[in-house]
From Swiss-Prot:
The gene is SOX15. Residues 1-47 are annotated as: Required to promote HAND1 transcriptional activator activity. Keywords: Activator, DNA-binding, Nucleus, Phosphoprotein, Repressor, Transcription, Transcription regulation. Residues 49-117 bind DNA. The modification Phosphoserine is found at residue 37. This is Transcription factor SOX-15. Residues 138-183 are annotated as: Interaction with FHL3. Transmembrane segments: none annotated. Widely expressed in fetal and adult tissues examined, highest level found in fetal spinal cord and adult brain and testis.
Amino acid sequence: MALPGSSQDQAWSLEPPAATAAASSSSGPQEREGAGSPAAPGTLPLEKVKRPMNAFMVWSSAQRRQMAQQNPKMHNSEISKRLGAQWKLLDEDEKRPFVEEAKRLRARHLRDYPDYKYRPRRKAKSSGAGPSRCGQGRGNLASGGPLWGPGYATTQPSRGFGYRPPSYSTAYLPGSYGSSHCKLEAPSPCSLPQSDPRLQGELLPTYTHYLPPGSPTPYNPPLAGAPMPLTHL
């Protein structure tokens, strides 16, 4: 004997599957329609559109695949070189079918992408390893710094082109009874300043022979015709 409550539960349990089945039946044709519809040719962005193939590309598409299978270790650049040499050996009658196919592909490409323009990509120029020494010299000149190296020390702070006195160093000589002697060292030619093009028009002051501190001033005779001072009287 069937209970009335059980029939109600059975009727309630059958209602949700009927609703889901109806929803799946309504969405099924839409999914099948969207999956089977082909993409329109004009939906691809122009940046990703490739150029139409020319006659050589149409001919070499099959030849390249065949040559790559015969020579798997051959580089792609070598394959292109050989295909180009073979294409030049063909006569006009052998090239005609590929030329016609290239014209057909170009017409279809123009119809599908009327706003297409070929924009070749430029290769980025590789920067140098570092700035040259000439560039550093020009930068120092513009900033007012010296053109020579940092090891050069000038004695004239105003110009930096004054005479550099020779450096004296005391060295112990064996057999000299413990006496120290002064050893004169000539300045190296690398330490001399270079010519500055900004100061070519200026006259640099003349310098006499260098005298160490404490040495007497050399006697300079007076000019002819000038009266001598009577300081000895």
